[in-house]
A protein has these predicted regions:
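Exposed loop/turn and edge beta-strand positions of beta-sandwich/beta-sheet ligand-binding modules
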Residues: 28, 65, 109-111
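Cys/His-rich zinc-coordinating "finger" modules and their low-complexity flanking regions
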Residues: 52-58
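Radical SAM enzyme [4Fe-4S]-AdoMet core and its adjacent flexible, acidic
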Residues: 181-305
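Flexible mid-to-C-terminal extensions adjoining Fe-S/redox cofactors in radical SAM and related proteins
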Residues: 1-46, 50-52, 301-380
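Canonical Radical SAM [4Fe-4S] cluster-binding loop centered on the CxxxCxxC motif
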Residues: 38-49, 61-96
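Radical SAM/AdoMet-radical enzyme domain recognition
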Residues: 95-116, 123-237
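A short, flexible beta-alpha/helix-coil linker loop
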Residues: 49-50, 85-89, 179-181, 240-242
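Short acidic donor-binding/metal-coordinating loop in glycosyltransferase active sites
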Residues: 71, 117-118
């Protein structure tokens, strides 16, 4: 990886602003300039050798780009680290609105349709929604791949898993986390959900863990070893300052990788670098032959848009274009959680296929968004 000019966000007003990644004596810095709030300088990596060796190489690795649509603001958990603040009193998006988004906000090259939330499995009509999405994709001559991004609790119900499998769910992504967040009973349900998906023929694309405490790392790695090939990939993420997560451990990606490598060396586990889309936010390895994606998200202070020209592509914020997941959750946090009214535009090169998609939201009002809940603190 090399130093380069890029685009970042002003963490005060959330405008997109010019930035530059620069190597200094103490590590890699992101220096950005907001027209209103001036210059800011943040250290984004301390290990210069690690930074210089990061290589974007997908020759041996294929990841579906995917398009992600929020289908509900409700959730059956209240995870303290989540970027999404659930509202169980709100009304779910109408199925027609979700179908409109899929047809009009994304093109055929996007890949699988990923249903997200808060927690999509709390929708009582989810099987029917999946059926209608499959029918739409068939009509549009697109791949009929529907995926659910879930906390996995509802998956502990085998009969319900059978319903979504028969409706057309092809795969799931499970954010399981360490049991310190939700307790061991919830964790056991999530583990049962993995077994049920496998039994009903639903592919477990990944199981993700967010750590509340770095001391939990070894326990998480041991659980992944016990799960083995039940998931195609396992993701381990330390916290970042997005949404409700100020108390999570925050450190650099090289520290994260080294911590896991030290545990593997001590336990005698094999460590093999896997070619992938490595950057300052994620790093791929195989541990005892099992694929691990080691993740360290940026936050609004350190976001580097040059590293986010990829999927999954998301449509989370009314009136804003379709962009990368991490970028979207920051904008969502600003609009919904913090009450900013964002008038800033997103630079074209970071949009999802701008030459093919009309991003103007003109044919549908975002009925599921209750404007009274968004306290308009600032107009940007």
């Amino acid at each position: 990886m090399q130093d380069t000019k890029t685009i970042s966000l002003c963490h005060i007003c959330y405008r997109h602003c010019e930035a530059e990644r620069v190597t200094k004596e103490d590590g890699i810095h992101l220096i950005k300039t907001c027209p209103e709030h001036g210059v800011s300088d943040y250290l984004v990596e301390t290990n210069k050798e690690f930074y210089n060796n990061l290589t974007y190489d997908k020759s041996g690795y294929s990841i579906p780009q995917g398009i992600m649509v929020e289908v509900t603001d409700k959730c059956n958990l209240n995870c303290p680290h989540c970027y999404h603040k659930p509202d169980n009193k709100t009304t779910d998006k109408p199925i027609e609105q979700i179908l409109w988004q899929i047809e009009n906000r994304f093109s055929a090259e996007a890949g699988a349709v990923i249903l997200a939330g808060a927690e999509p499995t709390v929708r009582k009509d989810l099987p029917e929604l999946i059926k209608q999405i499959k029918a739409l994709l068939k009509k549009l001559n697109r791949p009929e791949d529907v995926c659910i991004l879930t906390n996995g609790v509802k998956l502990s119900d085998r009969k319900w898993v059978k319903q979504i499998a028969e409706a057309g769910t092809r795969m799931v992504m499970i954010g399981m986390n360490h049991h310190s967040y939700q307790g061991k009973k919830v964790h056991e349900k999530q583990l049962k959900g993995i077994e049920n998906c496998i039994a009903e023929g639903i592919f477990v694309y990944y199981v993700g863990y967010t750590l509340e405490n770095l001391e939990h790392m070894e326990e998480v790695l041991e659980e992944i070893q016990s799960l083995g090939n039940k998931a195609w990939q396992y993701r381990i993420r330390a916290g970042s300052d997005i949404g409700r997560s100020p108390d999570e451990p925050q450190f650099f990606l090289s520290d994260h990788v080294q911590l896991i490598k030290d545990i593997c060396d001590r336990k005698g586990w094999t460590w093999e670098k896997e070619p992938a889309d490595d950057n300052l936010y994620h790093y791929m390895v195989k541990i005892n032959g099992i694929t691990h994606r080691i993740i360290q998200w940026s936050d609004p202070k350190t976001i580097d848009m040059e590293q986010l020209q990829c999927g999954p592509w998301c449509d989370f914020v009314p009136g804003k274009p379709v962009t990368n997941f991490l970028h979207q959750i920051m904008l969502r946090d600003a609009v919904v959680n913090e009450g900013y009214n964002l008038h800033d535009t997103v630079p074209t090169r970071y949009l999802f296929q701008p030459e093919q998609v009309d991003y103007a939201v003109t044919e549908w009002t975002w009925k599921s968004w209750d404007d009274s809940k968004v306290k308009q603190k600032k107009s940007i």
